[in-house]
Every structure is written in structure tokens, then in C-alpha cells.
Amino acid sequence: MADSEQYTIDVGAIFRAKLGEKTPKWLIRLGRKLLHEDFLNTFFREGYTGVDFAEKALEYMHVTLQVEGLEKIPKDRLVTVASNHPLGGHDALALVAIFGRIYDGNIRIMVNDFLMALKQLNGIFVPVNKMGGQSRNLSAQTDGIFHSDAQVLMFPAGKCARRVKGKIEEMPWRKTFLTKSIETHRDIIPMHFYGQNSWRFYFVDWIGKITGVNKKFPLAMALLVDEMYRAQGKTYRVVIGDPIPWKTFDDSRKPAEWAQWVKKRVENL
């Protein structure tokens, strides 16, 4: 295990670095409550990293995964795992825990700023932040991952599911996972993670949307740690489907159409 103190978080320091030294104390207190600073640091001090971190984090929160289809995962070739993204936290840890153990930690998963804050998963998590300059490097980062010898794990929707017209829906899938898989001859493994966040998460997201706040910062993202905290003790069903050969994706459909085809296949698992 690594030096554990380097992984602890100081919400006050984070807020002051982002918002200035005069950050209101009430805001810091609210941040500590929403981010469950003490709860997280108790676990972070254990010093776990990599796949061990993902497994132990789920164990710490008493989260159980009921995984179906493990026997379908090929171990003799490069693949891309394409999963739905209902939660924003536990589903990412589940990907690392499931496939990280099978592939001896040689995995890469593209995630947002929220998950990149987990330094314990440096080397496995790769940033795809759309806010700020990192987006300019996205193409190069994606190429580097797919042309490596690591197994690629992706949430093609890019962000976790939202409430749309009263229904919880996965966002349309971007085609990048598909075009890069074809380019690098990776079969695609479809995966369906069953679960959803609380009504409060979707309500806050709706408020952020109608007020325009989400254009600067996705408001509901601030609740993701609290959503994970509230989900302690839950059991999630995870279904892994048959690998889809990369040669399946011919010219009979456009790449964007094939991407939605895979999305539908995941939804039907």
C-alpha cells in the first residue's frame, strides 16, 4: 500500500484553491457534508490503489455486485467494454473491479473530473473533461488508449443518465468507442449496469438545466459522492453480453447508427 495521507482530501483547501481565500465558511461546511470528507478519509487512509482500491471501496460501502456473464469475457484479445452509465460513481468502480481483476489491472477507462479526483486510480482513469482545455487533447488521448495494449472500458454516453420528460434515460451514445474499436480491431463487450440515482439528483440536474447553471458546471455532479454514500448496502445487478466482433460494423449503417445499435443491445441485456 502507498503512503495513505497523500490520498486524503481537504475540502476547505480545495474550495479555497478554486474560489479564493475568502470562501465563506458555510460553503466549506456544506462541501464537507456533501462530500463526506471524514467518511472518505477513513477509507483513503487505508492506502489502497488500483484494482484493490475499487474492490475495497465497494466493500467499504457494503455494495454487492451480482455479475452475470463473466464466462463471456475473452482473455486472448483486445476488447472495448461498452457500458451504460446510470450512476456516475459505483458503476465506474464496478467496471474497474470486474475487468481489472480479469485483466491484471491492464485497463483504461475514460472518466470526468469527478472521478479523476480519485488519485488512487491514476493510470487506470484517463480524463475526458469537456470543460476547459483538456477537450483539445481528447483525440490524442483516445488514440493513445486504443492503440495501447490495455483493455478499454467506456461509458459512450459521456455522462450518467438524466431524467428526460419524466423518464430516466441514457444519453445518446457517441460513436468514438465504435470507430476506434474498428480501427484497432477490438471486439466490443456490451455491459448493462442496473441502477439509478435518487430523485433529488435528477431534480437538482433539472434546476441546473432551467437556470443555465449546467452550462458552466453540471450542478448535479456536486451530489455524486453523496449519492454513493446514500447507496451503501445496495446490491446491483450487472449483465455482460456476448462479445460483438468488430467486423460486424460494416457499411450498411453509419458509425453513429451502429453506436445506437450497440446501445440498444446493452439496454436489452
Where are these regions (language model features)?
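Membrane-anchoring hydrophobic helices of lipid-metabolizing enzymes
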Residues: 1-79, 85, 90-94, 104, ...
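Short, surface-exposed basic-aromatic patches at helix termini and helix-loop junctions that form
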Residues: 96-102, 181-183
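Short, glycine/acidic-rich beta->alpha junctions
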Residues: 87-91, 133-134, 169-173
